[in-house]
Curated annotation (Swiss-Prot):
GO terms for molecular function: rRNA binding; structural constituent of ribosome; tRNA binding. This is Small ribosomal subunit protein uS13. PANTHER family: 30S RIBOSOMAL PROTEIN S13/40S RIBOSOMAL PROTEIN S18, SMALL RIBOSOMAL SUBUNIT PROTEIN US13M. Located at the top of the head of the 30S subunit, it contacts several helices of the 16S rRNA. In the 70S ribosome it contacts the 23S rRNA (bridge B1a) and protein L5 of the 50S subunit (bridge B1b), connecting the 2 subunits; these bridges are implicated in subunit movement. Contacts the tRNAs in the A and P-sites. One of its GO terms (cellular component) is cytosol. Keywords: Ribonucleoprotein, Ribosomal protein, RNA-binding, rRNA-binding, tRNA-binding. InterPro entries: Rbsml_uS13_C, Ribosomal_uS13, Ribosomal_uS13-like_H2TH, Ribosomal_uS13_bac-type, Ribosomal_uS13_CS. It comes from Xylella fastidiosa (strain Temecula1 / ATCC 700964).
Length: 118
C-alpha cells in the first residue's frame, strides 16, 4: 500500500481514484495532482515506482488536506456561531443554513422525528 498524506491508498485502484480517498482531494484536484507529478491517471497504485509516489507526495503536500482542512472547516463554523450571525444560529440549532424549507422535510439536518404528546 502506498501511503500519501497519512492515508493508505488501495493498491488495486487507479491513481486518480485512489487519491480521492484523501480528505480534501476530489476528482478535479486528483487529476491536477497527477498532471503536475507527471503520473498517468490510469496507472494502478501498485504499479507506481517510489519516485512517482514521492512526486505525488510533494504535489499533495501543496494543498490543505486531511486534519488541517477539517480543523479549518470546524474553526470557520465555530467562528460563525461565535459571531451570532444568521448562519451561526442555524448551525447552533441544527437547522438548514441556505434557505431550505423546514416545515416539512429537512429531516437529515434535524434528525429523526420527535413525537409530540397530546
Amino acid at each position: 500500500m502506498a501511503r500519501i498524506a497519512g492515508v493508505n491508498l488501495a493498491i488495486q485502484k487507479h491513481v486518480w481514484i485512489g487519491l480521492q480517498s484523501i480528505y480534501g482531494i476530489g476528482r478535479t484536484r486528483s487529476r491536477k495532482v497527477c498532471d503536475a507529478a507527471n503520473v498517468a491517471i490510469y496507472t494502478k497504485i501498485r504499479d507506481l515506482s517510489e519516485s512517482e509516489i514521492e512526486r505525488l507526495r510533494v504535489e499533495v503536500g501543496k494543498y490543505v488536506i486531511e486534519g488541517d482542512l477539517r480543523r479549518e472547516v470546524g474553526m470557520a463554523i465555530k467562528r460563525l456561531m461565535d459571531l451570532n450571525c444568521y448562519r451561526g444560529l442555524r448551525h447552533r440549532r441544527c437547522l438548514p443554513l441556505r434557505g431550505q424549507r423546514t416545515r416539512t422535510n429537512a429531516r437529515t439536518r434535524k434528525g429523526p422525528r420527535k413525537a409530540i404528546k397530546k
